[in-house]
């Protein structure tokens, strides 16, 4: 014990319990930022080259309040975007979408659009690896769902229903988040899609 001046006794605080589950919200990080960090890790370790696709935007009007400051006031999407991420892993083309929800029992299919479903189907037709990463923020659970199962569910009623978590658990794979990489989805690709260890 350390004796402080004026007989001040420092109270020993008990170490707090550390949650085993990483919560992106508690760390000030969005699900998308965690995926981007994962992709940066994969790139730096020469495991895969996967990037977020830029969204093409048409700038219509810009205000210049000062010469050095331009402010975009009006802009539109040039075309409907396909999926969020694409790249190459072990010679395979990878293409995936990432969605986050606060719902506990399902994910709304309105989050997926017909042009995205069509794009995913085209990727699968070319033997690419296509999937969605689904993060249930309230439950702190993340799943990888192969695109074939998303497409099948979407076509039941043209994306009008919500996809139950039970369907995702039955047809997908839980991603166990970690420190490095944060969202290790390639582990699931290796084990369950490519058939490796």
Swiss-Prot record:
Cofactor binding note from Swiss-Prot or TrEMBL: Binds 1 Mg(2+) ion per subunit.
Pfam families per UniProt: RecU
Enzyme class: hydrolase
Localization of this protein: Cytoplasm
EC number: 3.1.21.10
Single Gene Ontology MF annotation: magnesium ion binding
Xref: InterPro entries: Resolv_RecU, Restrct_endonuc-II-like, tRNA_endonuc-like_dom_sf
GO cellular component terms given for this protein: cytoplasm
Presence of the UniProt keyword Transport in the record: no
Cofactor(s) annotated in UniProt: Mg(2+)
Family to which the UniProt record says this protein belongs: Belongs to the RecU family.
List of residues binding Mg(2+): 82, 84, 97, 116
Signal peptide coordinates: none
Example GO biological process: DNA repair
Keyword Ligase recorded: no
Positions of the record's site feature: Transition state stabilizer: 99
The protein's name in its UniProt record: Holliday junction resolvase RecU
Xref: CDD domains: RecU-like
Keywords: Cytoplasm, DNA damage, DNA recombination, DNA repair, Endonuclease, Hydrolase, Magnesium, Metal-binding, Nuclease
Function: Endonuclease that resolves Holliday junction intermediates in genetic recombination. Cleaves mobile four-strand junctions by introducing symmetrical nicks in paired strands. Promotes annealing of linear ssDNA with homologous dsDNA. Required for DNA repair, homologous recombination and chromosome segregation.
Superkingdom: Bacteria
HAMAP family: RecU
Known catalytic reactions: Endonucleolytic cleavage at a junction such as a reciprocal single-stranded crossover between two homologous DNA duplexes (Holliday junction)
Coiled coil: none
